[in-house]
Amino acid sequence: MKGIKRWMQAAVLAALTTGATGLAGATELKHWPPEAAAKLNALIASNANKGAYAVFDMDNTSYRYDLEESLLPFLEMKGVLTRDKLDPSLKLLPFKDTPEFKESLNSYYYRMCEVDDLVCYPWVAQVFSGLTLKELKGYVDELMAYNKPIPIKYYSEGKVVEGTVNPPKIYSGMQELYNKLQENGIEVYVMTAASEELVRMVVADPKYGYNAKPQNVIGVNLLLKDNKTGELTTSRLQIKKGKYDQARNLDLTLTPYLMNPMTWYEGKMGTILGWIDQWKKPILVGGDTPISDGYMLLNGVDVEKGGMRVWVNRKAKYMPQMQKWWEESAKRQQALGQAVTADKNWVVVKPEEIQ
């Protein structure tokens, strides 16, 4: 409990101090390849204290690995999440049990993804329903400190196989970039296809080094319920109304009910328009997955004013997919008589280069 209170107090202090112009230049991009660092430094210098903003994906972009995809089996391993506790609305298919294998929620999630990612993306945020934000914050911190692979069993091509998943591993380079941007008066937003509340527990907690403002974390939204009064809300609605109460929200319970914004695929670009700024584009966008981050990378960056795209090249098959997309997009722009920007200003780095 004391740790959670310290998190909230530190988050408020970080929000007040990180953007102070007196800190400009305090952070250096030491964990970036020299060429990439030079480009980013020039971008920051030319946009410092001019009302600019940047948008980053979280999982596999701002840290290595995936928060929800490790938290789910971690909480199953601890007995916190079980099939019996799963909200009935989330039991979309029969569980696939055998005499040797009682299917786990993690295996069930993978089978949801086999239907379509648009099914499993929301499901893996909804699966944590029934827990309070205070409980979830404690579990997220426990996961982040775990530092060991988490064993999993799941179906692959009809057979049960064993594997492991890793808890998130902080990218030092992204910590530096988040802080340098904010120190130079450039707002940093997180646009995640994961649960907004879960990601906020990492990126807005100063002990993890990003110092993002909790209000600037945008992700999959689930209604929060006050079990004493029955009142429904979300952090995003509170932020929109200027009534965000992070401390009070810790006692609220996550429900399985989805509401806008829905921040996956083209929804990330739509959320920039609807929840950040309809007309002003970000000067920097970061991502790692073509279909999930591609729309905001291609359509969201103000390239004509020097804006840049950071691509974390973490999977061999994704790089040619993204490159093909930006080449096709550039041809489409040219055919339409538009400024050809889709293939411009890409900064490509590998995970180990920013670790």
Regions found by a protein language model. Give the residues of each.
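A generic alpha-helix surface/boundary motif
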Residues: 66, 118-119, 197, 266
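C-terminal cap/substrate-recognition subdomain and adjoining C-terminal extension
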Residues: 27-39, 45-47, 51-53, 138-189, ...
